[in-house]
A protein has these predicted regions:
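A short glycine-rich, Lys/Arg-flanked "PGG" loop and its adjoining helix->strand segment in the class I
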Residues: 257-269
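Conserved class I S-adenosyl-L-methionine
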Residues: 170-178
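A short acidic, Gly/Pro-enriched loop at the edge of an enzyme's catalytic core
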Residues: 230-242
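Conserved SAM-binding loop of SAM-dependent methyltransferases across substrates and taxa
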Residues: 181-192
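Conserved SAM-binding strand-loop segment of SAM-dependent methyltransferases
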Residues: 217-230
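Feature captures hydrophobic
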Residues: 1-155, 161
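Substrate-binding/catalytic lobe of Class I Rossmann-like enzymes that use SAM or dcSAM, i.e.
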Residues: 278-388, 392-394
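Conserved beta-strand signature within the Rossmann-like core of class I S-adenosyl-L-methionine
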Residues: 270-278
Length: 394
């Protein structure tokens, strides 16, 4: 098949880029040629059905390759996760021209924009999420106590672990910021008989959580509100405990202090706050492809910047735990469930969306496996609390 000079130039550039990733052997395929990278039997094949413009690769390797995969111009023959794990393990070899990507990378963190960003991801449809999440509808990192724990068991473990860390007592009040479909608050109400309030910006989650409260007869214990965290101080709220699981990533770097200010205003003196969030070793604007297609307003904070902001609100750290590998395993479960239900998903979305979602789950799993991002839980008190046990009680 005839190749243009431009295609040959782009092919050469792509090979020169990929031949740096020599840790594991793999093949690169083009229309009329094939290249063997590394020593030994290839473990996967990168198949370019169409070359990628050099200017796109220079601007952002991640965005160029991600969009090519979504279009079907690029395919992975073999295990997608293992291929991505190989490349992301050598993340320093990717390139990003941040000034050229400024529009994508730095979006507004206004209330209106953040509501739009949250609903664009979480309001895709409950029926879709039910296909690949577990029965609890937990869309956050599980906690695998045993190697063979199911995804469902890991999510139950995670919630139990968080509730133990919060040192709950019957009759206490608990706020869940970014409550999702409500499993954490439902478990807290059943096991500890607390009075809980959940807030979310997702209409789909709000509707499903309301239904769950009614179905399980928990109307006297739980309420859910469509509310932005910035509106919490406007209400006459005072909670014994506050928890936020997987929501901080949507807040934006400019608003971390504001977020913690809002928590401080509604948490009673001596109260406990557990913050569960994806983090990075250092401050970084984020991955261009993820920012454009998955979490438009998302930013991954560093652990150190959150600790610095906490001090401004007199939050005292009790414990910090990293659950990075638990998220890797959670994502691999999600990916398997997603692929197991691909025929049903084809009736809901087009091929581009499904390829995008598969890439998202696999890439995130590989990112956690390589320590590019972490998952931290910080347990803290508002001011000093000398009434808690002196050793870890969970």
């Amino acid at each position: 098949m005839f190749e243009t000079l431009e295609e040959k130039t782009e092919e050469k550039a792509m090979v020169q880029f990929l031949e740096r990733f020599t840790d594991y052997p793999f093949l690169i395929k083009f229309k009329n040629s094939e290249y063997h990278i590394g020593k030994g039997e290839p473990t996967f094949t990168v198949n370019f059905k169409k070359t990628i413009p050099l200017s796109d690769l220079v601007k952002s390797t991640s965005l160029a390759l991600g969009e090519a995969y979504m279009r079907g111009d690029l395919d992975i023959e073999g295990n997608l996760y293992e291929a991505l794990d190989h490349f992301l393990g050598q993340m320093g070899k990717f390139s990003t021209n941040e000034s050229a990507l400024k529009k994508i990378m730095f979006s507004s963190t206004s209330k209106k924009n953040q509501e739009k960003e949250v609903t664009s991801h979480y309001d895709i449809g409950n029926d879709f999420y039910k296909l690949w999440l577990d029965e609890t509808m937990s869309y956050s990192c599980g906690y695998f106590i045993h190697e063979d724990d199911t995804l469902y068991q890991a999510q139950v473990n995670k919630v139990d672990y968080i509730l133990k860390k919060l040192h709950l007592e019957e009759g206490m009040s608990l706020l869940d910021i970014g409550c999702g479909w409500g499993f954490l608050l439902i478990e807290a109400a059943k096991k500890y008989k607390i009075h809980g309030t959940g807030i979310t910006l997702s209409h789909e989650q709000y509707t499903e959580f309301q239904k769950r409260i009614k179905d399980q007869g928990l109307e006297d214990y739980l309420t859910v509100e469509l509310m932005d965290y910035r509106d919490l101080p406007k209400h006459d709220y005072q909670f014994d405990r506050v928890v936020s699981v997987g929501m901080l990533e949507h807040v934006g770097r400019d608003n971390y202090q504001l977020f913690l200010d809002c928590v401080e205003k509604v948490l009673k003196p001596g109260g406990l706050f557990l913050l569960h969030f994806i983090s990075a070793l250092k401050e970084h604007p984020g991955d261009p492809w993820i920012k454009k297609y998955i979490f438009p307003g998302g930013t991954v904070p560093s652990l150190r910047e959150i600790l610095t902001h906490m001090a401004e609100d007199n939050f005292h750290t009790l414990d910090i735990e990293n659950l990075r590998l638990h998220y890797n395993k959670t994502l691999l479960h999600w990916e398997k469930n997603f692929l197991d239900n691909i025929e049903k998903e084809k009736s809901m979305f087009d091929e581009s969306f499904l390829r995008m979602w598969n890439l998202y789950l696999s890439a995130c799993a590989a990112t956690f496996h390589n320590g590019i991002i972490d998952l931290h839980q910080i347990l803290m008190t508002k001011g000093i609390n000398n009434d808690l046990p002196m050793t870890r009680w969970y």
